[in-house]
A protein has these predicted regions:
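Flexible "cap/lid" loop of the alpha/beta hydrolase fold
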Residues: 46-54, 58-88
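Conserved alpha/beta-hydrolase "nucleophile elbow" surrounding the catalytic nucleophile
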Residues: 40-45
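Hydrophobic, aromatic-rich cap/lid helix
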Residues: 91-113, 131
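Glycine-rich phosphate-binding loop signature in dinucleotide/nucleotide-binding domains
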Residues: 28-34, 120, 176-181
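Short beta-strand/loop motif that positions the catalytic acidic residue
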Residues: 119-120, 126-128
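Active-site loop/oxyanion-hole signature of alpha/beta-hydrolase fold enzymes
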Residues: 2-36, 171
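Conserved alpha/beta-hydrolase "acid-adjacent" motif
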Residues: 133-139
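Catalytic active-site module of serine/aspartate enzymes centered on a nucleophile-bearing elbow/loop
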Residues: 149-150, 155-181
Length: 181
């Protein structure tokens, strides 16, 4: 069974903070009785990694795409500055309000999972686009810190691997999933 979660819907009626989002995400994951395989891109990867750290016995495997394990504070601040100048319509395509995205990013600045990465023992696939300069270094480092991980780079791909290289991503995912069944 496969479930796709809407992060924006998970925050409806709640404060737009990482803690609120992670709590809602955890509640969704906790509904599953069996071990789960989590796959997340960007913010979804951060949530999946956080959950695997907090619930190592529940996570069978992880796929982290464009992942960070220690938030790049300067990049987040710069990104938030840019967000303030962008029209609200740019955020609607993701289901978020502009103010919520800015608030969420602000609350993520202090996230740092370095001291907890040792809790992740499940197989981990880390994927990053060749041209994703904001996340490639961190993704490679994360792969080196996790004992049961492998790193795959998608050629000619930036941040949104799922839309920029869907076939390449699907092939990498399928090989990984075949190996954990």
């Amino acid at each position: 069974r496969s479930v796709s979660l809407s992060l924006a819907e998970m925050l409806e009626g709640k404060a737009a903070t990482y803690r609120e989002l992670y709590t809602a995400f955890s509640e969704e994951c906790d509904k599953e009785n069996d071990e789960i395989v989590l796959c997340g891109l960007s913010l979804g990867a951060v949530l999946a990694l956080n959950y695997a750290i907090d619930h190592p016995d529940k996570v069978k495997a992880l796929v982290l795409i464009a992942a960070q394990y220690k938030m790049p504070k300067k990049l987040l601040k710069f990104q938030n500055m840019l967000f303030r100048f962008m029209p609200n319509a740019m955020f609607k395509q993701f289901g978020f309000k502009k103010a919520d995205v800015i608030s969420l990013c602000d609350t993520m600045a202090e996230l740092d999972f370095r001291d907890s990465l040792c809790k992740v023992s499940c197989p981990v696939l880390i994927v990053c686009g060749e041209k994703d300069d904001a996340n490639k270094k961190a993704s490679k480092e994360l792969a080196s810190y996790l004992s049961n991980s492998c790193y795959r780079e998608l050629l000619k791909t930036c941040h949104e691997a799922n839309t920029e290289a869907p076939e390449g991503l699907a092939a990498v995912l399928q090989r990984f999933y075949d190996g954990i069944e």
